Regions:
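N-terminal secretory signal peptides
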Residues: 1-11, 15, 19-30
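Bacterial lipoprotein signal-peptidase II cleavage site
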Residues: 32-44
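A residue-level marker of the well-folded mature domains of exported/periplasmic proteins
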Residues: 42-371
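Short, aromatic- and cysteine-enriched interfacial helices/patches
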Residues: 6-7, 34, 371
Length: 371
């Protein structure tokens, strides 16, 4: 189904956050992407942007808003939500929040009476239980949204879920969209994927990616690495160079933030007119990204959470699913390297992905079970 690279470094994201960013062994974050740090070096959350209405929203993140991946994607989702909700005011996010500081960071916003506190990854699920329980009694107008979190698996130790919800993107749709593009654009029938850490979301994305590519172009093979971390661009370069030289890979998709930048460097060195990258989770197609032909874009559904708070239906530990129907998942712009007829085919397949008729769960599971 796919071949795992020999260049792997298993690492605990949570443990690596405390070690810094010096080596591959320190590359990790529980939610996805970005480096560790402390609240002391982060934004205090005192400044604000957006509207001046009766609601306030703030985000706590593991990395920085300019990381080009996970954290920036969350920040852009937050900005879009505030722009479409003029009665909400956005406080500046707390960046580079380490696990040890996550609870105190959340508590500071609770003390300010912030109506919606967003944690950008499941690392916050394991550190906020006590803060959430206390806030339910002392500040019932405060609500918590934790992204990339399965409430049935990751909120089991919460004593109160009255003011908590999570967001789960449709990973199968995301992977399928990327796979359709890769399958139609590869000339060598060899594609690659780099993930920061082996999580259920990572393996689901890759399995759908490969299954979709094989459906549109039979015979496609996949190379993968799920343990690359999120900060070492040079590792992304090494992995991609290895796959280009040994496996003739000509299309890459990544889920590893800064590591993806390194993969793009290797693709460009091999020839930007013949070697392509599909970016995620933000749309970065442009002249400064010569290998990027499109992007799989994730919106973290913060606007829906705001609507639920205003409507009085927020809470209960429910998960908001981001998918193609509610624009939680989409494809970004196309580079002019994607021919018009290929773009038309992609649109046709994307409609099938959206309707659920393109891939079956069994087709994806058949690949995922081998990983």
């Amino acid at each position: 189904m796919g071949k795992k690279s020999i260049l792997t470094t298993p690492v605990s994201r949570r443990g690596a956050i405390t070690l810094g960013l010096g080596t591959v062994a320190t590359l990790a974050l529980a939610g996805c992407g970005g480096g560790g740090g402390s609240v002391d070096s982060a934004s205090t959350g005192s400044a604000s942007t957006g509207g001046s209405g009766s609601y306030k929203v703030a985000m706590i993140m593991s990395g920085t808003v300019t990381d080009g991946g996970w954290d920036q994607g969350h920040y852009e989702s937050l900005k879009r939500a505030v722009e479409s909700h003029p009665n909400w005011e956005m406080l500046e996010p707390k960046e580079n929040t380490a696990d040890a500081d996550a609870a105190s960071a959340a508590q500071s916003y609770v003390d300010m009476g912030v109506n919606l506190i967003v944690g950008n990854g499941n690392q916050f699920a394991s550190t906020w239980a006590e803060v959430v329980a206390d806030a339910a009694d002392s500040n019932p107008d405060v609500n918590f949204l934790i992204t990339n979190t399965d409430p049935e698996r990751e909120l089991t130790d919460y004593t109160s879920l009255d003011h908590v919800m999570t967001v789960l993107p449709d990973f199968m749709q995301t992977g399928a969209l990327a796979g359709v593009v890769a399958g139609l654009m590869t000339k060598t029938k060899s594609i690659g994927f780099i993930g920061g850490m082996k999580l259920p979301s990572t393996t689901k994305k890759y399995a759908a990616f490969l299954a979709a590519a094989q459906k549109v172009t039979p015979g496609v093979t996949g190379q993968y690495n799920f343990e690359a971390g999120f900060t070492d661009a040079s590792l992304g370069t090494k992995l991609t160079e290895q796959w280009i030289n040994s496996n003739n890979v000509d299309v890459m998709w990544g889920d590893a933030s800064a590591v993806d930048n390194g993969a793009r460097q290797a693709l460009e060195a091999a020839g930007a007119d013949t070697h392509f990258d599909i970016a995620q989770p933000i749309d970065i197609v442009g002249d400064d990204q010569p290998t990027v032909i499109t992007s799989t874009v994730t919106d973290w559904m913060i606007g829906q959470a705001m609507d639920d708070i205003e409507g009085g239906s927020f809470g209960g530990g429910k998960a908001i699913t981001g998918n193609m129907d509610n624009k939680g998942i989409s494809l970004g712009k196309f580079s002019d390297k994607v021919p018009a007829d290929v773009q038309s085919k992609i649109a046709e397949y994307a409609d099938q992905v959206k309707s659920g008729s393109f891939l079956t769960d069994d087709e994806v599971s058949a690949i995922e079970s081998t990983l």
